[in-house]
Amino acid sequence: MSPESRKLLNIIILGIGFMFMFTAFQTSGNVAQTVISSLNSTSFHGSGYTSLAIIYSVFSASNLIAPSIVAVIGCQMSMFLSGLLYSAYIAMFIQPYTWSFYTLSVLIGIAAAVLWTAQGSCLTINSDDTTIGKHSGIFWALLQFSMLFGNLFIYLAWKGEINISDSDRRTVFIALTVISLVGSVLFFLIRTPESDDAQEDDISNSAADAEGTMSAQSCFAKAIDAFKRSLKLSITKEMLLLSILVAYTGLELTFYSGVYGTCIGSMKVFEADAKSLIGLSGIFVGLGEVLGGGLFGLLGKYNYFGRNPVVILGVVVHFLAFYMIYLYMPSDAPIASREGTYLRAFINPSKTIALACSFLLGLGDSCYNTQMLSILGSLYPDNSAPAFAVFKFVQSVSAAVAFFYSNYLLLHWQLLILVIFGFFGTISFFFVEWGLTRRSQYNSM
C-alpha cells in the first residue's frame, strides 16, 4: 500500500472510530435528561443539564493540559484511553448513582480535551497541504453520521413509550456502551504513516538519543510556548470578533444536542410518540449536519463567493427554526417535570414541524462550523493549533454556561439569548471576512 493510501485509510479509520464513539455519546447526551426524569429510583438526584455543564466546564480547562498528555503517551493511546472514559460514562446509565454520574462527568471533560487534541494531531500527521481539505471533509462527514445511527436506534427502541422503564434503559445503554467500545478499539488499527525519506527516521532516532534527559525539558518548553501563543492570539482583534460567533456555536450546540430533544420528550401532546420522537429529532439534526458538511466541506473548493453567503444561510435557517419553535413549543418544556407539560403555545404542535426544526438546526450548525474552521485556517496558517485551542475553549465555556441556565430559564428566554448572540456573532464574522478579503487582495497586487 502506498503512503498516500495508508494515510487515507488512517483518516477513514479515524472517522469511523469517532462515528462509533459519538453515535453512543451524542445519543446519550440527547436522552440523558429524559432518562433521568423517568428514573424509578428515588436515590438518584442528578441532572442531565448539570452533568453536561460540568463536562464542558472541565473540557474548557483541560484544553490547557491536553497537548502535554498527548505528547507523552501519543495520539493512538490518548484516543483509546479517552474512549474508555466515554464508554464508562455511557455505562453509568445502566445503573446510575448520583456520585458516579458527576464523577464521570468530570473525567469525561478531561477525556474530551485529550481526545480532540489527539484527533487534530492525527489528522495533521496523515495530511499535507494538498490533502488536508479532502481529509477534513471525509472525517467531518463520517463523524456527522453518528447523529443518524444512534438516534435511529433510540427511535426504534422507544417507539410508543411514554415513560422509560428500567429494563428499557438498561437495554439501550448496554448497546450504546458496546458501540462506544468498538470505536475505541478501532483506533489501534491506525498505523504510523511511512516516511518518504528513510534517512529521516535515522536522524530522528539519533537526535532522540543525543537529547537524552533534555527531552522532558524540551517538551515543557514547547508546552509553555504554545500556551503563551494561545494567550497572545486570544486578544487579537480578529479573534475577539470571532469569539462572539464561537460563543454562539457553543450555545446552539447545547440547544440542539441537549435542550431541544428534552423539550420534545416533555410535550404530552405527542402522547405515546413523545419519547421516540427524541431519537427521530436527532436523526433529522444529523441529516442537516451531513447535508451541510457535504455541501460546504467536501465541495468547499468550488465556493467562489467567499464564506459570508454560507454564514448568512446559517443565520437564516437558525432564526427560522427558532421562530417556529417559539410558535409551537410551550415555554416550560425545557424544565418540565417527569409528568411532562400540558401547556400549549401559539399554534398547534405537530411532528412535522418538530422534525423540520431539527433539520434546520443541524443544517445551520454545519454552516457555521465549516466556515469557522475555514476562516481560522486562513487567518492563522502558522498558528493553527493555538487558534483552534482558543476556538474550543470559548465554545466549550459558552456551552457549559448554556447547560447551567437550561435548568432554570423558560424556552423563550433561551431562544432570545440564541438570537442575540447569533445576530451579533454573524455581523462580527462579516467584519473579519471583509478584512481578510481586503488583505488577500492587497497581497496579490
From Swiss-Prot:
Location within or outside the cell: Membrane
Glycan-carrying positions: N40, N163
Any single Gene Ontology cellular-component annotation: membrane
Top-level division of the source organism's lineage: Eukaryota
Record's bilayer topology term: Multi-pass membrane protein
Transmembrane segments: 8-28, 53-73, 74-94, 98-118, 138-158, 170-190, 239-259, 277-297, 309-329, 345-365, 385-405, 415-435
This protein's UniProt keywords: Glycoprotein, Membrane, Transmembrane, Transmembrane helix
Primary location group: membrane
Family of the protein in this entry: Belongs to the unc-93 family.
Protein name: UNC93-like protein MFSD11
Organism: Xenopus tropicalis
